[in-house]
């Protein structure tokens, strides 16, 4: 006998459904609860902190069970999704009244971290992406999909570093990868990883899935037909989303290739160090996004973050954005736009739920409210003249047909769900109005019946009532029950009263309940038809949502530029960064002291700045503000400076700070060297490189050697625009030895035992490091500081007396290479070509080498 046959029919049904969804939690609807059994129950009780109970038995052992109330399920789902779990929702689809045996059930949706669309499960100002990754012959295919907007993209990173940068940029909530995926370390420290069968990544299968989704014969029109690795990932991704959503995906209509050469590439370390959307502690406070994002709509906020994480290289597109921001700023239009945009809200995600047919009544009400704001938006934008803004305004024009339909169809304040009706407005459908009138007329009839019966029989305690269990009834107090006429049939006895039914009331009950049932059934039918009526307008509404999002970002950046005194940057193709009175966009907002603005000049004749100065003097802030200003210019934003001319960049690299990578077993120094190696391999003459305190994680001479050699390589072999901060004073000799380098420093002034940081950038090298003064500020005991001063004096005297040459006094040849020079014999051997020597010459060379020993 099969194992399931030992169970009740209900448990047999559960086991069958669980076998179809073995790797995810199954929420099994039983009445007013979703129940979980066996290992699912144990896991859910730990994850959700709910009670673990028992039900029935299996093989002589009680079956573990846990459950959550159906009306509170969204909160529990939100917690599970946050933890990276997926959940299959199994509903009762049969009628308990007519079912023989267990009520029919089926899985109606699968909630996964990357495919959720429910408002309660999403962070409204962050994209919610699902991604798939594929690896072959050292190269990668990577696809991302935002189910809440239909945005579907693929790319093909060529190295692990580039792939890691993409994962950092997109931060997918769920990541699909094949069972034979080799670089598994890319999956570490992230929730929502999903192993998938290898065949789901086959190219032919992928093309078939994608053509089926888009209704096309091939993918040539999308420009992705040659991106084989990316298509393998995209095919797996679309199949997985279809499997989990259990419905059509009409809002996913295209696939775009995300070309790396169109963007300024930021690697994972750069995104982290510049604190673009996440600070070093993992939060969102004091980040660039926190300063710039005052968008009026959640969808605008999400778009701004995408711009920040993917700065552009196309100067024409960036100038269009800058022109648009300038026009809105000059007209002060953002003041009027913001309240109107706020009323429009997050229609992008409402449209996704509409496409998936999971929208709720209040989604429709919000969509109606958004549509009602469009005439006001049209009026406000009528004065705009820039072609980019005019085009956005055209896409955001009112859609009268949709607005009128929703105004006619949906009540002013509909309930949360359609389940109990009350959603469709009066006057929308004549038949529905008639059934409702019949059902609503019950109140008048019951009041009249109660008055008539009370007067006819002289029972002043007589009342007519209704409850869901017993239906309509006539209630009489126990003290007057003797006055009840014979045709009253007792239905229920209470402690102080009796309840009766009479034929007339029973007939009315049948009529009312039938009319309510008919009204509800018709209302649900009309609700489904409403989706069909709206679907032809879906693409137009999605274009509208995109246009409103862009308008929101542009007006937001105009407001930020106006409020924070930003200037318009000049974008040029030639390499170089020229900034007058530049400021750090975040630090200037959070510091209590006046922020000291500083200039920077980088050009082909001044490609590297060696930056010295005291710790806490502002070197890192100066470097970061340069990178952030360049990044802001490359999203088309105004920047915090008096003036700025920014040359086109291909990459921004940062090597700032480090900590142990315990998960990978890498020390601080190893992390530092890995990031340095990435820069030295991948930077180009069009890159901006920030190098801060290279070599501090090892011995003094090793560190100095590495810092010197790295700076020399960047200057002579790569020619990248570089800011090189160092505490090795010896490196200030480099500008004297190599072309196109310069020294700058941040100054400080000592007063006795105290120190004042000036935070102003000056030309030339710093005179000293002020390390002991900073230690005193940090609270190091005065006795320790005093001993340190004594030791410093001794070391300085020792250094002056030493015969060993300092890097600042050795000749140029030695200073350019801190690696030990080859010996005379090694040099002589390297100059000998044995194939060019006769036997006699070879013997003579051997005697000559012997004399060198």
UniProtKB/Swiss-Prot annotation:
GO CC annotations on file: cytosol
Annotated GO biological process: mismatch repair
Keyword entries, A-Z: ATP-binding, DNA damage, DNA repair, DNA-binding, Nucleotide-binding
Binding of ATP, residues: 613-620
Pfam families per the UniProt record, alphabetical: MutS_I, MutS_II, MutS_III, MutS_IV, MutS_V
Gene3D superfamilies given in the database record: 1.10.1420.10, 6.10.140.430, DNA repair protein MutS, domain I, MutS, connector domain, P-loop containing nucleotide triphosphate hydrolases
Gene Ontology molecular functions: ATP binding; ATP-dependent DNA damage sensor activity; damaged DNA binding; mismatched DNA binding
Domain of life: Bacteria
Family statement: Belongs to the DNA mismatch repair MutS family.
Record function comment: This protein is involved in the repair of mismatches in DNA. It is possible that it carries out the mismatch recognition step. This protein has a weak ATPase activity.
Name of the protein this chain belongs to: DNA mismatch repair protein MutS
């Amino acid at each position: 006998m099969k194992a399931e046959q030992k169970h009740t029919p209900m448990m047999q049904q559960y086991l069958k459904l669980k076998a179809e969804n073995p790797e995810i939690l199954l929420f099994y609807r039983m009445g007013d609860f979703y129940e979980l059994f066996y290992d699912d129950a144990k896991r859910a009780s730990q994850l959700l902190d709910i009670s673990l109970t028992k039900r029935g038995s299996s093989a002589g052992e009680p079956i573990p069970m846990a459950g959550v109330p159906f009306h509170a399920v969204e909160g529990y789902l939100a917690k599970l999704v946050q933890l990276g779990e997926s959940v299959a929702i199994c509903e009762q689809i049969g009628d308990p009244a007519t079912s023989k045996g267990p009520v029919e059930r089926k899985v109606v949706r699968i909630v996964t971290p990357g495919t959720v669309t429910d408002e309660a499960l999403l962070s409204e100002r962050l994209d919610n992406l699902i991604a798939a990754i594929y690896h072959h012959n050292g190269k990668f295919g990577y696809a991302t999909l935002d189910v809440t907007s239909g945005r579907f993209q693929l790319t093909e990173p060529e190295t692990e570093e580039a792939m890691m940068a993409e994962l950092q940029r997109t931060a997918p909530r769920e990541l699909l990868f094949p069972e034979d995926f080799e670089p598994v370390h890319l999956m570490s420290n992230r929730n929502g990883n999903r192993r998938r069968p290898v065949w789901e990544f086959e190219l032919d299968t992928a093309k078939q899935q994608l053509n089926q989704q888009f209704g096309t014969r091939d993918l040539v029109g999308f420009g992705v037909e040659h991106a084989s690795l990316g298509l393998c990932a995209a095919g797996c991704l679309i199949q997985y989303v279809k499997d989990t959503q259990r419905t059509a995906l009409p809002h996913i209509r295209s696939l775009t290739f995300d070309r790396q050469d169109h963007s300024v590439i930021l690697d994972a370390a750069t995104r982290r160090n510049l604190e673009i959307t996440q600070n070093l502690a993992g939060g969102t406070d004091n980040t660039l996004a926190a300063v710039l994002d005052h968008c009026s709509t959640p969808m605008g906020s999400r778009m701004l973050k995408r711009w920040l994480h993917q700065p552009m290289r196309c100067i024409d597109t960036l100038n269009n954005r800058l022109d648009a921001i300038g026009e809105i700023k000059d007209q002060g239009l953002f003041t009027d736009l913001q309240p109107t945009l706020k009323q429009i809200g997050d229609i992008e995600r409402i449209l996704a739920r509409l496409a998936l047919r999971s929208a709720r009544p209040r989604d429709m009400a919000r969509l109606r409210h958004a549509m009602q704001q469009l005439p006001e938006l049209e009026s406000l934008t009528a004065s705009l003249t820039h072609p980019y803004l005019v085009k956005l305004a055209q896409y955001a024009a009112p859609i009268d047909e949709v607005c009128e339909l929703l105004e006619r169809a949906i009540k002013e304040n509909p309930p949360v769900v359609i389940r109990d009706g009350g959603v469709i407005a009066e006057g929308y459908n004549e038949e529905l109005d008639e059934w409702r009138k019949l059902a609503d007329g019950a109140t008048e009839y019951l009041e009249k019946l109660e008055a008539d019966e009370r007067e006819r029989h002289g029972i002043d305690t007589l009342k007519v009532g209704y409850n869901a269990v017993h239906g309509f009834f006539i209630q009489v107090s126990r003290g007057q029950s003797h006055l009840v006429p014979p045709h009253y049939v007792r239905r229920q006895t209470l402690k102080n009263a009796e309840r009766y039914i009479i034929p007339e009331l029973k007939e009315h009950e049948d009529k009312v309940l039938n009319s309510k049932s008919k009204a509800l059934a018709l209302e649900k039918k009309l609700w489904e038809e409403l989706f069909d009526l709206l679907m032809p307008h879906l693409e137009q509404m999605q274009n509208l949502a995109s246009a409103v999002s862009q308008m929101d970002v542009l007006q937001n950046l105009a407001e930020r530029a106006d409020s924070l005194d930003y200037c318009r940057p000049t974008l040029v193709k030639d390499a170089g960064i020229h900034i007058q009175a530049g400021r750090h966009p975040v630090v200037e907002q959070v510091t209590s002291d006046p922020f000291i603005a500083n200039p920077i000049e980088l050009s082909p004749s001044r490609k590297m700045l060696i930056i010295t100065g005291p710790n806490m003097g502002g070197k890192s802030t100066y470097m970061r503000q340069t990178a952030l200003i360049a990044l802001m210019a490359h999203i088309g934003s105004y920047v915090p400076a008096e003036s700025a001319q920014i040359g086109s960049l291909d990459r921004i690299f940062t090597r700032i700070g480090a900590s142990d990578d315990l998960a990978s077993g890498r020390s601080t120094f190893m992390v530092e060297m890995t990031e340095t190696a990435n820069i030295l391999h991948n930077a180009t003459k069009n890159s901006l490189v920030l190098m801060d305190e290279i070599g501090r994680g090892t011995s003094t001479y090793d560190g100095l050697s590495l810092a010197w050699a790295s700076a020399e390589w960047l200057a002579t072999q790569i020619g990248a625009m570089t800011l090189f901060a160092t505490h090795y004073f010896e490196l200030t000799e480099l500008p004297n030895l190599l072309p196109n380098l310069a020294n700058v420093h941040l100054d400080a002034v000592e007063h006795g035992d105290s120190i004042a940081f000036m935070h102003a950038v000056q030309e030339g090298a710093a005179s000293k490091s002020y390390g002991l003064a900073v230690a005193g500020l940090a609270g190091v005991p005065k006795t320790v500081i005093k001993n340190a001063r004594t030791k410093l004096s001794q070391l300085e005297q020792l250094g002056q007396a030493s015969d060993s040459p300092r890097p600042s006094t050795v000749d140029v040849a030695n200073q350019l290479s801190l690696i030990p020079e080859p010996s005379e014999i090694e040099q002589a051997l390297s100059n000998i070509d044995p194939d060019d020597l006769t036997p006699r010459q070879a013997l003579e060379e051997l005697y000559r080498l012997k004399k060198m020993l």
